[in-house]
Amino acid sequence: MEIRLRLAPSPTGLFHIGTARTALFNWLYAQKIGGKFLIRIEDTDFLRSKSEYTKNILDGLKWLGLQWNEEPVKQSDRISIHKKYIKKLLECGAAYRCFTTEDEISELREEQKKKGLPPKHDNRHRNLSKEEIETFISQGRTSVIRFKIDEEIQIKWIDQIRGEIKWQGKDLGGDLVLSRRAMGYEIGDPLYNLAVVVDDNFMNITHVVRGEDHISNTAKQILIYEALDFKLPTFSHTPLILNNEGKKLSKRDCVTSIDEFRDMGYLPEALSNYMAFLGWSPKSATSEILSLDEISKIFELSDINKAGAKFSWEKLNWINSQYIKNMETVKLSETIGKYWDNMGWDPPSQEWAIKLAILIKDSMTLLKDAIDQSKPFFLLPPIQKEGKDFLESNDGKTSLKLILNYLIEQNTGKVDKDKAKEIINEISKMHNVKKGILMKSLRVAFFGSLSGPDLIQSWELFSESKSDISRIERCLKSI
C-alpha cells in the first residue's frame, strides 16, 4: 500500500509557523517510510480565501525545502463532488434538511447560556415530514444540511501520538452542519468536515497528521467516513505550539508567519531544524543540529509529545547561529551580500567579501546581523568617548603616529595578517611601546571604540580596501 500524507491549509492568511510545523511532520514521515507528501488548498471559505495566500503558503513550503509529490489540489474545484456525497447522505437517511433560522439558533444559545449549558443544536428538524418540509420551503425559508449524530454513540480510534482516544456523541454539539444555506431543494456550498472526508478519500490519504485542535473534528469526520463507507485513515494529533504562559502561540505573542522569520534573518535549514524538535523528542538523536535528511531517517510519529511545546527564541537563535557558523563561506558571503546590496555597500572584491563573512560569522545570530557587524568596514564610525579617553590616557596619539609613519616610510603596501603582526612587533621593540597599547589605539582608529572583531584580520581588510591609513589619519585629527 502506498503511504500518502497531506497538508491541507486554508489560504486565509500568511503561512503560519504552526501550519509549517504540521507540514514538516507530514513531510518527514513521508520521507521516512517512502510515502508521498501532498498539498490540498482548503479554499471553500470564499470570503476570506485569497490566491495571494495560496501563493504565500506554497512559496513558504519551497523555502523550507518541503517539496510535494503531486500537483496541489484546490478544494473549491470539487464542490460538485462534495454536493454529490451530501445528496447520498440525504438519500440514505444519514442527513436531513434543517430550516432553523439564525434568530432561532441565537435564542436557543441564549437559553443554554442562562442554564450554564454549552452551545448545542437541539436537532429540532431531524424528523420533519415531507409536508412540513414543503411548508418551510413555500415560506421562503432556507435550509442547511445536517448530519445525524447519535448522542449515545462512542467514537474511538487509535491515535499514533496519543494512543486510544474516545469521544461521546453527546459532546459534539448536536447534529453537524454539512452545507451552507440554500433555497428550496438546493444544496448549499459544502462545509469543512464533509469536504475534508470526501477529499481525503479521493486523494487516497492513508495518514492524517494535524494539530490537536482538530481532535473533535476527527470524531465528527469518523462518523461521516463510516456513513459513506470510506476507509478510515490513520490519525495523529500533534501538540500545539505554546507561548511562555503556556497558551496557544498567537500573533499577539510574537511573529508567527514564515515570511517574518525569513525577513528577520533566519535560515530555512535552521528554522526547519528547530521546528522538528518543537514537540518531537527522538530517542536516537545524537545532536540538536540535524539536516532534514538526517531527521527524516530517525523520525517517528510516536516520538512526538502529547503535551504542548513552548516556543523558545533563545533555542531558535542558537540553532540559527550554528547554521551561520557552519555555512559554506562563498554561500555565506553571497547570502549576506544581499544585505550589503540593500544598504548600498559595495565590497572591493569577492575575496574581500568572503574574508569579511568569515570574520563576522561567529558574531552573527541572524543574517541581518551582518549589517551591524559589517558597517564599520564600509562606513567611518564616529570616535566614541571610551576610545578618546583611552587614547588620551595612554598616549594613544603617539602610538598611532608611530604606526602611520611606519606604514608610509616602509611603503608596506597591502598588509596581510602576518605583516600586521610583524609591524606591531617591530614598532613595539623599536620604540619600547606595549603591543597592547598599539593594538588598542589602532582599534580605536579603525572602529571608533575598544570593541570589535579580530584586529589583525580586520587590518588586512582595511588594507585591501585602502582605508587603513586614512582611518588612522582621521583619528589623529579628531583627538
Swiss-Prot record:
Coiled coil: none annotated. A motif ('HIGH' region) lies at residues 9-19. PROSITE patterns: AA_TRNA_LIGASE_I (PS00178). One of its GO terms (cellular component) is cytosol. One of its GO terms (biological process) is glutamyl-tRNA aminoacylation. It is found in: Cytoplasm. A motif ('KMSKS' region) lies at residues 248-252. Catalyzes the attachment of glutamate to tRNA(Glu) in a two-step reaction: glutamate is first activated by ATP to form Glu-AMP and then transferred to the acceptor end of tRNA(Glu). This is Glutamate--tRNA ligase. It comes from Prochlorococcus marinus (strain MIT 9312). The gene is gltX.
